[in-house]
């Protein structure tokens, strides 16, 4: 519908150029066509006249009137009016919305998919949990947001690569190995010889037992076997990392999250990428030495103070491999790089960008882009869920999935803006009622499937071609409300991709489900009149399709029965 209105406005602008109202060399402005906040202001509004007023040396409202007069007639537009300082509001005919139903039916799974990305490459990194323990609910929120964002970008025509960065070379891995070794030697977290910064969760005992019994872990095609030797710290380190990565991948698979690339921090050192990044920074002239340490002049690039890159003992600070890692993303040809992180990592953003800018390689400012999520509080029976002993102090993603479902967990972890704190109510997530938003939306999809089964059981032969031809019969308030919501879907997908906010898909699906349930309760679908029945079934099938398309972007199933 936006394309139709943009075409009409474009023709109106050409008419104003032809009659001299606008100078002949006036270029069409980058005007917007958007839905007003309230339906009283029409179905769509444009600011075209306000943008052209200066070129026309005219008052914006006067130019809006001229443009309104110059617009070609369209059977899909019932009224055009001027509002405010020069907005032009369009009221559409039911035929415009009825035609959108036909578009849904024709395009099917592709309805809502766009070409904004035009096949360009984008790398989306998310989760990137240290392989030192089970995934917790915060990792779950990162997984849900990141995976859905990747799906939304793919739907907008981007060539998406999903990436998981393993911090397998830091001090946390050393602490993990020491913790597993201590368990293998018979110590407990309360023992006097327990490592000072050791991990205390019961899962450490699971890793140690698997190592001592000589278990073999298949880590993405590489077999790692426990050597049973509690004194062999290096073997323990390799086995523990493989074991916990395998556990994390198991949870992610259950959560319907997968990746194209698993990138190991250790490979940055092995392949010389950290040293390469450091040498590029030195060569650019944005480093200096002081107190035996190598510093980055990060204040030249918006940081609040310069940062140490290499300490006096020769080791690198933690942000240097982060810079090196993102340099590889640039070298791998990502036009865009998006990193989803917990809000507690906010301080690293400026440093990483400063390091990349300081290399003077033509990397754009603001690259990579970041999506930050806030923490999650888990509630049951009105009280916060106590921290899990197995995980050593947090609620695991596996716990939530087992208590509710992957569908419910994904929905609730996506359904709010990432930068807002989130309360996950286990009781609500399990509820089979309209108060549960994921149930409410899935039930709308299942309800259509049920109606189609009932039609078959009653011996009604559904003729979709006939239904499309008879959509003009559906001009009542509730039918048009469903059609209006269906027409919004491509815009919502596009906006979610532009803003990197997949939660907008969830919000939209609730509104579509509400419109559908309201229509269903106020309109008998399986009526005796075949023309009316086919038209209503066609509207229901179109709704089913859009619900399925949107749920797929969230990684949530679209059940046929509930």
Swiss-Prot record:
Organism: Xanthomonas oryzae pv. oryzae (strain KACC10331 / KXO85)
Keywords: Aminoacyl-tRNA synthetase, ATP-binding, Cytoplasm, Ligase, Nucleotide-binding, Protein biosynthesis
Motif ('HIGH' region): 129-139
Species classification: Bacteria, Pseudomonadati, Pseudomonadota, Gammaproteobacteria, Lysobacterales
One Pfam family linked to the record: Arg_tRNA_synt_N
GO molecular function: arginine-tRNA ligase activity; ATP binding
Stated family: Belongs to the class-I aminoacyl-tRNA synthetase family.
E.C. number(s) listed in UniProt: 6.1.1.19
Signal peptide (UniProt feature, chain positions): none
Keyword Ligase attributed: yes
This protein's name: Arginine--tRNA ligase
UniProt cross-references to SUPFAM superfamilies, sorted A to Z: Anticodon-binding domain of a subclass of class I aminoacyl-tRNA synthetases, Arginyl-tRNA synthetase (ArgRS), N-terminal 'additional' domain, Nucleotidylyl transferase
């Amino acid at each position: 519908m936006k394309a139709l209105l943009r075409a009409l406005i474009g023709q109106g602008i050409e008419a104003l150029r032809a009659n001299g109202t606008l100078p002949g060399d006036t270029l069409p402005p980058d005007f917007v066509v958007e839905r007003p906040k309230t339906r009283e202001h029409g179905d769509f509004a444009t600011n075209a006249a306000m943008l052209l007023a200066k070129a026309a040396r005219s008052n914006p409202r006067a130019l809006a009137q001229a443009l309104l007069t110059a617009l070609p007639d369209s059977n899909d537009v019932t009224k055009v009016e001027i509002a405010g300082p020069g907005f032009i509001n369009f009221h559409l005919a039911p035929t415009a919305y009825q035609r959108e139903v036909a578009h849904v039916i024709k395009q099917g799974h592709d309805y809502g998919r766009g070409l904004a990305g035009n096949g360009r490459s984008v790398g989306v990194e998310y989760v990137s949990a240290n392989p030192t323990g089970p995934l917790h609910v915060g990792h779950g929120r990162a997984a849900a947001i990141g995976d859905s964002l990747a799906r939304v970008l793919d739907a907008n025509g981007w060539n998406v690569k999903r990436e998981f960065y393993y911090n397998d070379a830091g001090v946390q891995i050393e602490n993990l190995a020491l913790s597993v070794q201590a368990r293998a030697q018979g110590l407990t977290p309360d023992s006097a010889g327990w490592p000072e910064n050791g991990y205390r969760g019961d899962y450490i005992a699971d890793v140690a037992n698997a190592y001592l019994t000589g278990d073999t872990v298949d880590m993405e095609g590489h077999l790692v076997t426990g050597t049973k030797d509690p004194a062999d710290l290096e073997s323990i380190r390799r086995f523990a990392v493989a074991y916990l990565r395998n556990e994390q991948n198991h949870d992610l698979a259950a959560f319907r999250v997968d990746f194209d690339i698993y990138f190991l921090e250790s490979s940055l050192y092995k392949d010389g990428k950290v040293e390469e990044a450091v040498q590029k920074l030195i060569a650019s002239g944005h480093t200096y030495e002081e107190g035996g340490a190598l510093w980055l002049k990060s204040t030249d690039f918006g940081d609040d103070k310069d940062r140490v890159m290499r300490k006096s003992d020769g080791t690198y600070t933690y942000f240097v491999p982060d810079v090196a890692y993102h340099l590889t993303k640039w070298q791998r040809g990502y036009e865009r790089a998006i990193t989803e992180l917990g809000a507690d990592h906010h301080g690293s953003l400026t440093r990483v960008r400063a390091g990349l800018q300081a290399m003077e390689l033509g990397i754009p400012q603001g690259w990579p882009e970041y999506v930050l999520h806030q923490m999650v509080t888990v509630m049951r029976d009105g009280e916060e869920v106590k921290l899990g002993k197995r995980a050593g102090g947090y609620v695991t993603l596996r716990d939530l999935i087992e208590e509710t479902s992957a569908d419910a967990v994904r929905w609730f972890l996506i359904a709010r803006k990432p930068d807002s704190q989130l309360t996950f109510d286990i009781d609500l997530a399990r509820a089979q009622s309209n108060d549960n938003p994921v149930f409410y939306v899935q039930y709308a999809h299942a309800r259509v499937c049920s109606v189609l089964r009932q039609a078959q059981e009653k011996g009604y032969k559904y003729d979709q071609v006939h239904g499309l031809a008879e959509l003009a019969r559906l001009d009542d308030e509730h039918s048009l409300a469903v059609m209006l919501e269906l027409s919004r879907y491509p815009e919502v997908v596009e906006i979610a991709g532009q803003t990197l906010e997949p939660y907008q898909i969830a919000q939209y699906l609730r509104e579509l489900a509400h419109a559908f349930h309201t229509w269903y309760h106020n309109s008998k679908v399986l009526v005796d009149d075949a023309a009316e029945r086919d038209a209503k079934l066609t509207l229901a099938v179109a709704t089913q399709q859009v619900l399925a398309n949107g749920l797929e972007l969230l990684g949530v199933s679209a059940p046929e029965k509930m």
